Amino acid sequence: MNKEQLKTPFFMIDEAKLIQNLEIAKQLKEISGVKLVLALKCFSTWGVFDIIKPYLDGTTSSGPFEVKLGYEKFGGETHAYSVGYSEDDVREVADLCDKIIFNSQSQLAAHRHIVEGKASIGLRLNPGVSYASQDLANPARQFSRLGVQADHIDPAVFDSINGVMFHMNCENKDVDAFIALLDSISERFGAYLNKLDWVSMGGGVFFTWPGYDVEKLGLALKAFSEKHGVQMYLEPGEAIITKTTDLVVTVVDLVENGMKTAIVDSATEAHRLDTLIYKEPASVLEASENGEHEYVIGSCSCLAGDQFCVAKFDQPLHVGQRLHILDSAGYTMVKLNWFNGLKMPSVYCERTNGEIQKLNEFGYEDFKRSLSLWSVQ
């Protein structure tokens, strides 16, 4: 299968780049003794789970279908968490998960009887401190619904749970900032943690970022684990799949209205939603920082502000030219939608031997089925 013959748009996952990240994860585990569970909310493309499984300990989920997917397709430890469980949700995951983490003390009280004796029980705590560049993704934002606030904790709860989860980071590339959060938690919650079997520090710790001091992180996690006598967990998502995947698109038109725009056969609204939500411009492989030809890379959706980025190029772009939107694995394939009835990107993996393998493709029948299965009678 030749990449140049593949119809755009498509995602291309690079196995070699994925393994580079996984080897760093392996190093962190060896230094720290931490267990790593893949955050399926970020990346759930199970077609490459066989590459990831030898390196990680399992999966963590934010909804019942993710729990089932992790259990069926990944194995290892299956962690279940949800901001709000219904009783049906809990019954659905009770026999699948190794650990279940409740978001509130009221949820814990309402549903623990369903999972007692089946899964290790945890509670999410909100430490009131966090590392997040945008308020939208800040778990400690004002009026946060995520986890139990410190001043609301009933101390008796720690006699009836096995572990806790703190999720307080979003793309934290600063090891010292993470260690400061770790120290804060140890100081504030240490007496409670000493009673537990395990502690998860959630996700958002970007330990595969270039230059990240993995050894320093590992030693800090190990020290925390030994101090409180707990098994430590991290829930990486982006850290595992960062810089592994391109969204490959084709320029279908060039227009100008005070600025040149290259319209491509994809859309942030449908295929790379976080670009739109967080207003974080994408990066293009073919771009040049000092290029003389500047373009808006615009989508083919009807949303006026739907664009990937503004980029410069050494040569003028032309219709039919392919562009590679870099770092397009995290929170993309899990958020694909059918806005405007646009063609959904296929998904491929380039193996280390150069072979291209198809993982998924979509067609009109998928679009139609997502909207209705039956007509009114």
UniProtKB/Swiss-Prot annotation:
<dbReference type="GO" id="GO:0045312">
    <property type="term" value="P:nor-spermidine biosynthetic process"/>
</dbReference>
<comment type="subunit">
    <text>Homodimer.</text>
</comment>
<dbReference type="GO" id="GO:0008836">
    <property type="term" value="F:diaminopimelate decarboxylase activity"/>
</dbReference>
<dbReference type="GO" id="GO:0009089">
    <property type="term" value="P:lysine biosynthetic process via diaminopimelate"/>
</dbReference>
<dbReference type="GO" id="GO:0030170">
    <property type="term" value="F:pyridoxal phosphate binding"/>
</dbReference>
<protein>
    <recommendedName>
        <fullName>Carboxynorspermidine/carboxyspermidine decarboxylase</fullName>
        <ecNumber>4.1.1.96</ecNumber>
    </recommendedName>
</protein>
<comment type="similarity">
    <text>Belongs to the Orn/Lys/Arg decarboxylase class-II family. NspC subfamily.</text>
</comment>
<dbReference type="InterPro" id="IPR005730">
    <property type="entry name" value="Nsp_de-COase"/>
</dbReference>
<dbReference type="InterPro" id="IPR009006">
    <property type="entry name" value="Ala_racemase/Decarboxylase_C"/>
</dbReference>
<dbReference type="InterPro" id="IPR029066">
    <property type="entry name" value="PLP-binding_barrel"/>
</dbReference>
<comment type="function">
    <text>Catalyzes the decarboxylation of carboxynorspermidine and carboxyspermidine. Carboxynorspermidine is decarboxylated 20-fold more efficiently than carboxyspermidine. Exhibits some activity with L-ornithine, but shows no activity with L-arginine, L-lysine or meso-diaminopimelate.</text>
</comment>
<keyword id="KW-0963">Cytoplasm</keyword>
<feature type="binding site">
    <location>
        <position position="274"/>
    </location>
    <ligand>
        <name>substrate</name>
    </ligand>
</feature>
<keyword id="KW-0663">Pyridoxal phosphate</keyword>
<keyword id="KW-0620">Polyamine biosynthesis</keyword>
<dbReference type="GO" id="GO:0005737">
    <property type="term" value="C:cytoplasm"/>
</dbReference>
<feature type="binding site">
    <location>
        <position position="238"/>
    </location>
    <ligand>
        <name>substrate</name>
    </ligand>
</feature>
<feature type="modified residue" description="N6-(pyridoxal phosphate)lysine">
    <location>
        <position position="41"/>
    </location>
</feature>
<dbReference type="GO" id="GO:0042803">
    <property type="term" value="F:protein homodimerization activity"/>
</dbReference>
<dbReference type="GO" id="GO:0016831">
    <property type="term" value="F:carboxy-lyase activity"/>
</dbReference>
<keyword id="KW-0456">Lyase</keyword>
<keyword id="KW-0210">Decarboxylase</keyword>
<keyword id="KW-0745">Spermidine biosynthesis</keyword>
<dbReference type="GO" id="GO:0008295">
    <property type="term" value="P:spermidine biosynthetic process"/>
</dbReference>
